Amino acid sequence: MKTLYSLRRFYHVETLFNGTLALAGRDQETTGFAWWAGNARLINLSGKLLGAHVAHAGLIVFWAGAMNLFEVAHFVPEKPMYEQGLILLPHLATLGWGVGPGGEVIDTFPYFVSGVLHLISSAVLGFGGIYHALLGPETLEESFPFFGYVWKDRNKMTTILGIHLILLGVGAFLLVFKALYFGGVYDTWAPGGGDVRKITNLTLSPSVIFGYLLKSPFGGEGWIVSVDDLEDIIGGHVWLGSICIFGGIWHILTKPFAWARRALVWSGEAYLSYSLAALSVCGFIACCFVWFNNTAYPSEFYGPTGPEASQAQAFTFLVRDQRLGANVGSAQGPTGLGKYLMRSPTGEVIFGGETMRFWDLRAPWLEPLRGPNGLDLSRLKKDIQPWQERRSAEYMTHAPLGSLNSVGGVATEINAVNYVSPRSWLSTSHFVLGFFLFVGHLWHAGRARAAAAGFEKGIDRDFEPVLSMTPLN
């Protein structure tokens, strides 16, 4: 294979500690990196780097399968999933597996199958990872040029990008096919309190789908996180899958334009920084999605959202006091505003009290009581169904609160049930991971840009203090 440039220009930020750049070996002498620098030792060893990535995929899939089976083993069908600390079974239930009307679990066998399939897959990936890490060729360029690459080869890099985009597009279409043809998905908005249904009438209008992207991210608008019907979600996946697949084909067939060649840094560490930035954005969006959205993340499985629990409490006490004879339309609260109901600045009737800040909540148990101008007083007096009372009382006592101060008026009880909502776990973990990924992006982007500009910051290893100290042993 012909190398078009000197190895010195190829990746010199990684070799600041030594003069050698032999490709063999994975030790500090030959790579400039000690064992703890992980995959940095494999920058020029495409075969070994493949092994590291396949083994990592195996670990991920093994966790998914093992945790899945752990949750199945501990699952009690009589209790809601969100009371049992589950984070994987709610995802499977949302996809329509094993659940019936109202989100009731009627069959746990699909969950068991999912866990076993992931365990078997992880064994295959684990074997492949060990094979390529220990036995396979160190570099792929000579024997398998299709799988080989040189980090500076812009055309090859965009081809790899294209392949990744096609795989992402196929993944998006898997959800579409599940919703359309393979049993459907769970719809929390189905009449009577949620059910599994096939999505037949997809939203494919570009003005609707891309309208979400143009919305404000703030209250009442909520950007893409505000999506509240499955037709839009599945239709969005059709658009996303199509864009990814066609974009992937385009990147495979084309070479980067001159402006892209000039604007981007073309090195392994630069690609790492781009990937970390993308994952960071995904983490922050997922954090907001699981915290606020009760359509993609149905409250039957994940527990209520914070606003939902707060509004549920206001609703529960409105129901109670109305039965006791209170006139909920005119009762005044301690601040002079309505105790149970009030008007928003734009005139809609909303719940009063601290929960007024969550006036824009939409939830399947509440929407039937709304009219053209917000909550409908006559419906609140005549149309409240027992299932709505039960649902709101349940959600009121399962708020996703990990907060010391601002709890939206929800009554907190120090002797309450030991409960942490999956929404709290999932949103917090994705925020923290998204933040770490962002810091990693800044770090690696800075290093990659410094290397491309031809200067490096680092310790002068010839005069490092540790070199003059006595060895530990």
Curated annotation (Swiss-Prot):
Residues excised as propeptide: 1-14
Superkingdom in the source lineage: Eukaryota
Cofactor binding description: Binds multiple chlorophylls and provides some of the ligands for the Ca-4Mn-5O cluster of the oxygen-evolving complex. It may also provide a ligand for a Cl- that is required for oxygen evolution. PSII binds additional chlorophylls, carotenoids and specific lipids.
Post-translational modifications reported in the UniProt record: Phosphorylation occurs in normal plant growth light conditions. Rapid dephosphorylation occurs during heat shock.
Signal peptide extent: none
Transmembrane segments annotated in the record for this chain: 69-93, 134-155, 178-200, 255-275, 291-312, 447-471
Keyword Thylakoid: yes
Disulfide bonds: none
InterPro entries reported for this sequence: PS_antenna-like (IPR000932), PS_II_antenna-like_sf (IPR036001), PSII_PsbC (IPR005869), PSII_PsbC_sf (IPR044900)
Cellular localisation: Plastid, Chloroplast thylakoid membrane
Transmembrane found in the keyword field: yes
Modified residues annotated as Phosphothreonine in this record: T15
Entry's Gene Ontology cellular component terms: chloroplast; chloroplast stromal thylakoid; chloroplast thylakoid; chloroplast thylakoid membrane; photosystem II reaction center; plastid; plastoglobule; thylakoid
SUPFAM superfamilies: Photosystem II antenna protein-like
Residues carrying N-acetylthreonine: T15
Entry keywords, A to Z: Acetylation, Chlorophyll, Chloroplast, Chromophore, Manganese, Membrane, Metal-binding, Phosphoprotein, Photosynthesis, Photosystem II, Plastid, Thylakoid, Transmembrane, Transmembrane helix
Topology of the protein relative to the lipid bilayer: Multi-pass membrane protein
Binding-site residues for [CaMn4O5] cluster, renumbered to this chain: E367
One of the protein's GO biological processes: photosynthetic electron transport in photosystem II
Function per UniProt: One of the components of the core complex of photosystem II (PSII). It binds chlorophyll and helps catalyze the primary light-induced photochemical processes of PSII. PSII is a light-driven water:plastoquinone oxidoreductase, using light energy to abstract electrons from H(2)O, generating O(2) and a proton gradient subsequently used for ATP formation.
Assembly description: PSII is composed of 1 copy each of membrane proteins PsbA, PsbB, PsbC, PsbD, PsbE, PsbF, PsbH, PsbI, PsbJ, PsbK, PsbL, PsbM, PsbT, PsbX, PsbY, PsbZ, PsbC/Ycf12, at least 3 peripheral proteins of the oxygen-evolving complex and a large number of cofactors. It forms dimeric complexes. Interacts with PAM68. Interacts with HHL1.
The family this protein is said to belong to: Belongs to the PsbB/PsbC family. PsbC subfamily.
Protein name (Swiss-Prot/TrEMBL): Photosystem II CP43 reaction center protein
Encoding gene (name): psbC
